[in-house]
């Protein structure tokens, strides 16, 4: 699955005591280029907050800037704190937070000296464990609102253009598909054609870079949309106030830009998970990173439009996790390694691999912090559950590879790689090492 998913809906309705001037170029620049890290179709960029570099999810599906984790930072100064309540996906209960004003945000010479930030204290909302890197917050509308912003998923870079840069507009008009968007509650919406079962429907969708799935559809908002007959029940993620569940199914088709995708995987959240969500008029779903990452996309909020051009992944199949396992990062552990230098190179052995009872003179020891991965959820009836894998198991090896040398993304890519692939999983459960074997099976 795509663990992030639900976080990505923030529905904040608040009053403001002053107007922010917004992001602008610090120097006389035509553009700024920001490299990003992409994990599970999500975009993570470094931004300095009052001088401290933090990692933010770049999310068109949110309005305000949110901080929810500072675990990897010794100290971050926030100014003018005011206690508030936030409500969002998961349940009707509000979450305690603080609003902070007059903060300075800066990335690559793109700066806002008067930025409002919302700080969430509930550490259960921290999703760093799901993506495997420290993530401190989310930034949305205020990053996009005054400039032309390019997201190049192939090159993994965000480019922000100065409003006077006319050359780039001429270029994109020649090579990119233009579509009108409406900015409602400071989030971009557009109309497209959705076919779940047979009947096409013109549908209003949120363009949501903070949703790692391809498509989310809310059946409660579109009674004439038919849920496909073959579905799987899934844990979709965590919202402001609790876990979010729903179903996944293959739809007939979905159109974005000049491309109509056949048999994409649609996600259908349970109605109980969206009870507290206030939808804009006529909206029935979201378009997420599972589709957007197949394109190069320009967001032009000042002109209320977007531009898209197919990228290298345009024809990639829509796969899903066939194992039924949800894996999360569960901290770090010290791993002892010995290595032998050979003509300027080094052969590395873990303590398990060397296992000689003594060290040779030319072997050296080093200690490294390595990630721990644990099973966070096991889908009912999945091949992994039937094999015996349980929630809470710590992953030791996958197909002979030490788990601590992998990333969450490589693990997830393996678990959705191809039907029939054999997975040999070595886990540790309450001090006992167990091995399970199963084959990936597509049920959609």
What are these language model-derived features?
Residues 1-24:
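Bacterial Sec-dependent N-terminal signal peptides
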Residues 18-444:
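Pepsin/retropepsin-fold aspartyl endopeptidases
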């Amino acid at each position: 699955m795509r663990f992030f998913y639900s976080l990505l809906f923030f529905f904040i309705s608040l009053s403001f005591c002053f107007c922010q001037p917004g992001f602008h170029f610090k120097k006389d620049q035509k553009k700024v280029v920001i490299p990003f890290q992409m994990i599970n179709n999500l975009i993570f960029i470094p931004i300095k907050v009052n001088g401290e570099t933090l990692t933010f999810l770049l999310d068109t599906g949110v309005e305000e800037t949110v901080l929810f984790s500072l675990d990897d930072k010794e100290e971050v100064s926030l100014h003018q704190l005011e206690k508030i309540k936030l409500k969002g996906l998961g349940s009707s209960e509000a979450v305690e937070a603080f609003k902070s004003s007059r903060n300075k945000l800066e990335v690559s010479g793109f700066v806002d000296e008067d930025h409002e930030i919302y700080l969430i204290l509930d550490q259960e909302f921290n999703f760093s464990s799901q993506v495997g890197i420290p993530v401190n917050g989310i930034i949305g509308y205020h990053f996009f609102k005054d400039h032309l912003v390019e997201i190049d998923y192939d090159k993994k870079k965000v480019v922000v253009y100065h409003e006077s840069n006319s050359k780039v507009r001429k270029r994109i008009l020649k090579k990119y598909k233009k579509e009108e968007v409406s900015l409602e509650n400071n989030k971009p919406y557009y109309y497209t054609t959705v076919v779940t079962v047979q009947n096409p429907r013109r549908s209003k969708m949120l363009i949501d870079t903070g949703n790692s799935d391809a498509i989310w559809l809310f059946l409660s908002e579109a009674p004439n949309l038919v849920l496909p007959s073959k579905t799987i029940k899934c844990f979709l993620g965590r919202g402001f106030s609790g876990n979010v569940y729903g179903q996944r199914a293959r739809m007939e088709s979905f159109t974005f830009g000049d491309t109509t995708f056949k048999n994409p995987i649609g996600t259908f959240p349970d109605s109980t998970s969206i009870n507290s969500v206030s939808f804009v008029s006529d909206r029935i779903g979201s378009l997420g990173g599972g589709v957007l990452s197949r394109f190069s996309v320009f967001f032009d909020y000042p002109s209320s439009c977007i531009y898209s051009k197919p990228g290298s992944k345009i024809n990639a199949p829509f796969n899903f996790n066939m194992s039924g396992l949800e894996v999360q990062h569960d901290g770090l552990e010290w791993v002892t390694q010995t290595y032998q230098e050979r003509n300027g190179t080094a052969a590395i052995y873990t303590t398990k691999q060397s296992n000689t009872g003594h060290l040779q003179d030319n072997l050296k020891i080093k200690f490294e912090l390595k990630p721990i991965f644990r099973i966070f959820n096991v889908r009912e009836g999945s091949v992994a559950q039937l094999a015996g894998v349980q929630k809470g198991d710590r992953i030791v090896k996958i197909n002979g590879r030490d788990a601590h040398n992998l990333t969450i993304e490589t693990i997830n890519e393996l678990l959705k790689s191809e039907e029939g692939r054999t997975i040999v999983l070595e886990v540790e459960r309450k001090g006992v090492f167990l091995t399970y074997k199963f084959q990936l099976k597509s049920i959609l």
